[in-house]
Structure formats: structure tokens, C-alpha cells
């Protein structure tokens, strides 16, 4: 009997907490998945339009921002390939 009463009180408390928090966030969570999907698409577009170094710009072997590839040259600094 005590366990049943404790469960009922706990359920009422949790229900009250949910109702209180939904009143606080009314209008803020609307279309949450659509907004996150739009943000993800914008991020993908941003990644696809990343600026790259011009051809013949100096680069590093492992860390470069070349549009195509970093061309290694003997006894000279590597440059971005055309």
C-alpha cells in the first residue's frame, strides 16, 4: 500500500514538472527538427564552399588548404598544384 502511494505521488510530481516546463518553453521548440536540418544543410554548404589556396601558393605536406593537391618539390618548398 505504501509503495503504491509512493508511486502515485512520484507520477503526479513528474507530471506536474513536465507541465511546468512545457509552459516555460512554449513557442521555442516549434519545428526543432526542421531547424536542425536547415543548420546541417548550411554547414554542408559551408564545408563545400571552403576557400582554398591559389595554385603555386606555398603549402605543407600534411596540413594544407590547396584546392587540388600539394605538390612536393625536391630541395624547394612544396606548392599547391594547378
UniProtKB/Swiss-Prot annotation:
The keyword Signal applies. Disulfide bonds join 52-67, 59-70, 66-80. GO terms for molecular function: ion channel inhibitor activity; toxin activity. GO terms for cellular component: extracellular region. Residues 23-49 form a propeptide. It is found in: Secreted. The keyword ATP-binding does not apply. Keywords: Cleavage on pair of basic residues, Disulfide bond, Knottin, Neurotoxin, Secreted, Signal, Toxin. Expressed by the venom duct. Its main location: secreted. It comes from the Eukaryota. Residues 1-22 form the signal peptide. Belongs to the conotoxin O1 superfamily. The presence of a 'disulfide through disulfide knot' structurally defines this protein as a knottin. The cysteine framework is VI/VII (C-C-CC-C-C). This is Conotoxin MiK42. It comes from Conus miles.
Amino acid at each position: 500500500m505504501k509503495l503504491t502511494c509512493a508511486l502515485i505521488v512520484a507520477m503526479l510530481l513528474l507530471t506536474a514538472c513536465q507541465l511546468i516546463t512545457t509552459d516555460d518553453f512554449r513557442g521555442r521548440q516549434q519545428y526543432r527538427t526542421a531547424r536542425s536540418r536547415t543548420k546541417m544543410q548550411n554547414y554542408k554548404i559551408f564545408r563545400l564552399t571552403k576557400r582554398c589556396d591559389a595554385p603555386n601558393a606555398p603549402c605543407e605536406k600534411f596540413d594544407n588548404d590547396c584546392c587540388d593537391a600539394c605538390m612536393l618539390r625536391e630541395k624547394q618548398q612544396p606548392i599547391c598544384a594547378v
